[in-house]
Amino acid sequence: MICQLLWHEHNSMGSGREKKIRKLGDNFSLPYLKFDCDHNDKNYRASNRPFGLSTGLSVQLNASNMTDPFKFLLDNWHTIFKNGAIKLLPPEGWQIPVVLDQGAFEFQSKRQCLNKGCLNYEKNYDYFKKLKAFHESRGLYFYHPPIIGNRPVDFLRLRNAISKFTNSGSSLNNEILHKVIIYLRLEDTKEVRQVLTRCYDRYIKPFERDSSPSFKSKRSESSTRKIRNTRSSAQQESPIPETSAQSPVQTIQVNGSTSLKRPLIERGEQCEYCGLDKNPETILLCDGCEAAYHTSCLDPPLTSIPKEDWYCDACKFNISDYDPRKGFKWKLSSLKERSAEIFNTLGERNSSSKLTNLTEDDIELFYWSSLAESNSGFAPLELEGLSQAYTSTIQSSLPSKEVFPLEKYSSEPWNLHNLPFENPCLFNYSFSDLSSLTITRLSIGMVFYTHGWTKSSLSTGLLHHHRFGDTVTWYVLPPDESDAFERYLISSYPQYTMEDLNRSNGLPVIVSPSSLIENGFHPIAIDLRPNEFLVVSPNSYHMGFHQGFSSFESVNFATVNWIKDGLLNSSISVLKSMRIPSSVSYEAVIISMVLSKNPCFSSEWLIKCFEDMIANESASKNEIMKLVPNIQALKLESSVPLEIRCSNCKQPCFLSFMQCHEPKKFICLGDCVKEVSLNATSWMLFYRWDVHELSNLAERFVSLIRGPEEWTNRLRSVLSTSPKPQLKVLKSLLVDAEKAMLTTPETVNLRDFVQNANSWIDSVNECLKVASLKRKKDKKPPLFKAHDHWNNTSNLKDSAVLFKVLQTSRSMAFTCQEIENMKQKAFDLLEFRNRLINSFSGPLDKNTCQRLLTEAELLGFTIPELGIIQKYLIQFEWLDMFYSFETTRTTDSDLERLITYGVSAGIPEDNDYMIFAKAMKGRAEIWENQVYDTLSKSNISYDKLSLLRDEAMNLCVNKELFSKVVGILNNAEEIKNKIATLCERSQEKDFALRPSIDEVKEALASAEKLPILSESTVTLQKMYDVVLEWIRRGKRLFGKANAPLEILGQHLDYVEKRNSASLSLNDRPGPPMEPASRETSPDSEGRLTIRKKKGCIFCFCRLPESGVMIECEICHEWYHAKCLKMSKKKLRQDEKFTCPICDYRVEIPRLSNRPKLEDLQSLYKDVKLLPFQPKETETLRKVVDLASKFRQEMQALAHNPFGLTMAEVPLARFYLRKMEGAEILLVDETNLFRQKLHECVPIAPNPPPIIGESKSTRKPRPTKRQRQIMKQVAEGLLPASAIAPPKSSNEKKSSNNVKAVEAETKSKSEKSPKKNGTNISDANNKNESHVSLMKNWKLGSPAFVTLVKEKNSSCLCGEEFSPRDSFIDCTICERRFHYDCVGLNNEIADSVSKFTCPICMEQSGGIYPWQLRPRNGMHPDHISGFSKEVETDPKLGSSGYTLNNSKFDKAAVSKTLSAQDVSRLQKVSCGEHLYFGTDVFTPLGDMATSASMFSLDDSSEKTDAFTENFLNV
């Protein structure tokens, strides 16, 4: 019951605020701080200190001391208590890191006045409150003093400073103000003088005059003035309230309750100083807090309302909660700098002092001399720092387990966070809130920051840990001089009482060591440096100051001496007599120590303390019962809180208390005797435990302490009774010893004996242990489970082990049940062996063997005769396994295991069953080899694989390999059926029912993954190639032969989109339209063009307005600048523009070739002949249908028998514009309309030429071969001339020949007849001219041969051969030529078995099929005087060379090259012919459109017989 109550209350306490887990590396460290002491420093003072003081004892800690701090403290407690304090030096290298973020850590400081009288600013704060209350009672309200130098004025310091130089009540003149400013260390300015004068005249002077005795006597004679509110007589007689609890604000009665008067008026309606709302035009509102002030009430006053934002002093300086005790907010770096400034200021005051190379003695003397000067001619020095701030409200400098769990020093025993919670610390045995003692306190101070004389709370020990910075000097008095020192303090400072000493654990006063020595005290001095500890004993007064910027952390601790020496009891008695609350209950600590059963507390002194406490409690209850015999006594429930305090002595009532109902209060039993009005009706007695329960607890505790002797007697009695005692009796004695936590030698010996006995018994149990007959589930086939079951005897133990252990049991010094069980097991084993030997005399069968082995398993031991039975049983089981053999279920591994088991079981090799099993294994291996050999081939035979599958049905083969074979066959059959279905569907008469090309592509991809190649797959591939050839044909129509196959569908979508706008039948002819972004402009006759508001379309593309628009000056049609590839930067406002419709010479930018409508119709017509449906069919149909409908729409206008008149010119322009914007070419209509427009409205000097094709104007991309050349040039494999060959002299001569060709062509075109007023050339004449020109081009002329010989090279280019060049030899003349010079590449060269050069080909009368590209840039036309008569080489037949057509025919049959084969070779080199003498990136097909050049490719693109055959192929 007692334990449950205490631990319930303990666990219900809060765990504190949650802390964020951090890493030590996240903090910023300042480099100039000291974190460790230097033990070799000569400045360590041991003797000859100032004032003749002796230095305190220093102890060097070792490694063992660092692991158990309380053991060290208990061992050295006498020394600590005798000296009052000692200093501890940790080992070298031991240092707890500072976890403060030294760059961002910020704290609110506490101001300190370096003065003997008082260190803190309590008097200043009290004076300010009295002054404020005095003026508020007279209607002058203010919340903070005026501001000087960004700091509020300290009224008390100002009053003391003025009183030094003048009498109270007198006025201030300039001389006095000057002295006061110097005394207060202020800047002597006019504004400062005005503020000081107003503060004195307005605030201090009236208060001091009213507080003077003469003024009080005069006021008592006068009548009491009338005031609005009703006050008590005591308040009227005392004009100055003594405490802040008395409110000077006027009150009124509202609904029967007292309330303040001022809140009845909202803030901002009356002045904060005078409390009046008069003269509202002079009231100024603060833009921060909306407070109102009269401009005349401000200090200093304002003459007018400021126009800009105005803030009161409370908002400007953040002093709405003014408290002179509070300092600024500091960071470590700024406080260190301020400390240096203060030290320099003190040096300037005493010019004789040297501030450089000061020792600690010099600084100590300097401190006391500065303190003496503060009481003379200078004002006391103001210091700031942090004194004993709880780390629960501010960050600690020590790592804790909650915030830094990964830091090793977080668990260090000497870490102040862990010290109060160590097991020996008595703070763990109090169930009250001891956070004021267990939470560490951080102190940070600048130079000379002082910690006044104080002692630890509740007579506990105190531990200081210097964290970083300069030295802190401490003065300590022994504990036996504490009482005398308290009397000395009270006599020296009568304003303080003994209650002040005990309430604050000291006074904020400074007593110099010299004064202490003069009065008979014996102080010691200790210099605490970084990383050092200072242990202060209980009841020892100590005082310290900082010799520079430094910081230390402190915490309380309590050892067993806290109770043993009566320190806690005496401390609580003192607090009780002074009615000062205490946080610890002496009774709760005693009971908690008793219930803990800690061996550290198992002493006679705790028994005496516990018995004395019970005696006092019993005496107090008996006294109460005598005074009030009929008083009701109730036992407290466990839910009643432990913190119940006495109303008189303010101490916690833990064991019992008296409660009064009216008025309700609690009184302890000790104070209850002093109550006069004790009666049974209004008082009740409550207790947690009665005397009987406490007595039982004391008896158990006494038995716990005195139990070891009793237990030893019991052990001796058991050992003397029997030489071999029972082991369970010894174990029972050991359990009792462990419950009592005994540590006697007998207990240790018995524990070792029992442990050895238990280990021996474990070995006996392991020997007697029988393996379980339940076996785990096995994945093996059933036919092998029986064999493994009887073949595995590893779980059976050897019987010799049992008899050996039985022999060792005779030497054991105890008896137990396990020894008897072992004897019985040995008897059973001997009996089983006899029965096993008798079974050999008769016949053995399978059942008999199984029964004997089962009995052996039950016993758990094996004997030599058991192996014979096991061998017989295994052979029986193997035969059963063979009979249960099935080929469909058994794998090759099972068959191999069967053979292995048979050999291990002793089955002869000539046994019929063994011979059959090995034969099956051999057949399985042959089958497996055949399968692997078949699968390793690139083309697998389906029939052979089917035979292997059927053969495996009667063999024991690898099931995975068999499944693979079956899977291949199933997939092949599935794909075969799928291909057959596709081929069957391809013969459908309805083209819509034929399969799509995607289905075919998917089927071919699936077939490629299989190693089986069937004839149906080859057939389907050929049909698929037909569709691909149709797609390539469509690509060539649009000039995209080198593009991927998918480009046809994409481009057809683009064509369909463009044609749907340009060839739209909804677009009807009409007058020119004006863009919406432009005003209407007149036409050539001054008429305004019609401008539609919506649906206006322009340009060839017949799309709405977009971007920059250009107007034609002839037809006034608007065009998109981007359609004409015109940049806005190159256009001028006054520039005139003629569209390509009006002037055919203006080029229209084309992104791709425009095929003829007839070619697209033919392409669409051939779709019906394809076996599969291309994806582009529907789009092609839409394009052809739209163009056909548009052509029918123009039939009437194009075939008008009366010709074109001027009235129909806009109509002709309209249709021609639509045709030019389309992506297909209407050849007849386009030529007709261009000729008619030129005839009616001629702009160009010559009529437009007849066009038969529409090529792209876009600069072509480099081909694959050209990209390879660029890469080889970049890598240095080819010279730069391969890309841009230099001009030669032959290139200059070429211009004359070109001009001759142009003249000849032009003369023929001019002589052509005219039809319908249009200059149309005869196509037949044109073709004939091209053929004649091609026939006149000969390479075998003597001039060309001579030029080659002059170059001393066999190639056309005349250049020398390099090792990197690719070359080929002619089979006739044996000349050597470069690949690129004769128009070859690697693919062509590999396909040609015999090569005939261009010269030999020309001499034999043949046509060289490839384009010549000499490296020197020479064009064949550049060579004059080509021979027209060619001698035929008798070695050559009708063909120039033979072609190895291995890439086109699988039979690889060599045949003679004919004109039809040229197309195939031309396709091999498609897109790689380069024009001579031009840039290497310009393909010949684009250069052929130029009017100034003519080449072989030009002739190949005309409609002669050769090109017709080429295009058809």
From Swiss-Prot:
The modification Phosphoserine is found at residue 722. It is found in: Nucleus. CDD domains: ARID (cd16100), PHD1_Lid2p_like (cd15519), PHD3_Lid2p_like (cd15520), PHD_Ecm5p_Lid2p_like (cd15518). Signal peptide: none annotated. Residues 56-97 form the JmjN domain. Residues 211-253, 1063-1086, 1244-1268, 1280-1327 are annotated as: Disordered. A zinc finger (RING-type) spans 1096-1143, 1354-1401. Pfam families: ARID, JmjC, PHD, PLU-1, zf-C5HC2. SUPFAM superfamilies: ARID-like, Clavaminate synthase-like, FYVE/PHD zinc finger. This is Lid2 complex component lid2. It comes from Schizosaccharomyces pombe (strain 972 / ATCC 24843) (Fission yeast). The lineage of its organism: Eukaryota, Fungi, Dikarya, Ascomycota, Taphrinomycotina.
